[in-house]
């Protein structure tokens, strides 16, 4: 009986020690930059990209609700859009540029929205910075600050790539003939730097390259993009 009691005390002591161990202490916050975007009428009307200084991050959003048209909408509400939650990994040059710009803009503690009137609605955007060394955010539709504009273009180009990856997956499964023109679109956007960090959709491209049932030109385009992504990754390491 005494032995049993001693064992119980030992187990309890061990559990208490584990509870109070340093490993249970919450990890210190690490620097992160986020970009939020909202604009009704788009396939993805709302999304958020979060980037940590080690290059890891997330792309989260929600696809637009699916509706069967005005008549169907009168009978029942549109189905909610599917949630999007994807991990991302950005190259060191992109990460360095993002954090360097954020710090040069006082962690976004600046008035970044343009005061000009009659500007077209291009979507509500919010840049945020959070870290032990400071935090801040600014919201805008359009900004005349060149650094803010450049960051906006970077994040939107990353979002485009992520959305394109989902589109390629869909076409690969349901509309293989549509892959031909879509690959042309993606290659063009990469050339124009409106699609960045293509390595994040490498699984989608690899799946296309490996599918011998697809058109050879489609597979060649996917292989070309994969090679470019791998080349960019090796140069940044």
In which residue ranges do the predicted regions lie?
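Short amphipathic beta-strand/extended segments with alternating polar/hydrophobic composition
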Residues: 48-52, 69-72, 76, 81-90, ...
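Charged, amphipathic alpha-helical segments
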Residues: 91-116
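N-terminal secretory signal peptides
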Residues: 24-71, 75, 100
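Short, well-ordered, aromatic-rich surface patches in folded extracellular/luminal domains
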Residues: 16-41, 111-237
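A mature extracytoplasmic/lumenal domain signature
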Residues: 53-55, 63, 94, 102, ...
């Amino acid at each position: 009986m005494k032995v049993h009691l001693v064992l119980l005390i030992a187990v309890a002591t061990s559990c208490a020690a584990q509870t109070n161990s340093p490993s249970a202490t919450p990890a210190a916050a690490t620097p992160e930059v986020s970009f939020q975007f909202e604009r009704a009428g788009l396939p993805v009307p709302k999304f958020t990209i979060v980037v940590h200084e080690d290059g890891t991050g997330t792309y989260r959003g929600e696809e637009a609700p699916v509706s069967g048209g005005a008549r169907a909408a009168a009978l029942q509400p549109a189905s909610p859009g599917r949630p999007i939650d994807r991990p991302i990994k950005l190259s060191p040059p992109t990460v360095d540029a993002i954090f360097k710009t954020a710090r040069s803009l006082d962690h976004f503690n600046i008035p970044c929205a343009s005061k000009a009137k009659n500007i077209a609605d291009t979507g509500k955007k919010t840049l945020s910075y959070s870290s032990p060394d400071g935090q801040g955010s600014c919201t805008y539709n359009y900004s005349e600050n060149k650094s803010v504009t450049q960051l906006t273009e970077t994040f939107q180009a990353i979002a485009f790539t992520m959305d394109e990856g989902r589109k390629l997956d869909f076409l690969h499964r349901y509309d293989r003939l549509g892959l031909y023109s879509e690959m042309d679109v993606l290659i063009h956007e990469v050339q124009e730097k409106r699609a960045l960090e293509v390595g994040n959709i490498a699984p989608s491209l690899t799946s296309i390259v490996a599918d011998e049932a697809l058109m050879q030109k489609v597979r060649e385009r996917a292989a070309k993009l994969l090679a470019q992504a791998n080349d960019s990754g090796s140069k940044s390491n």
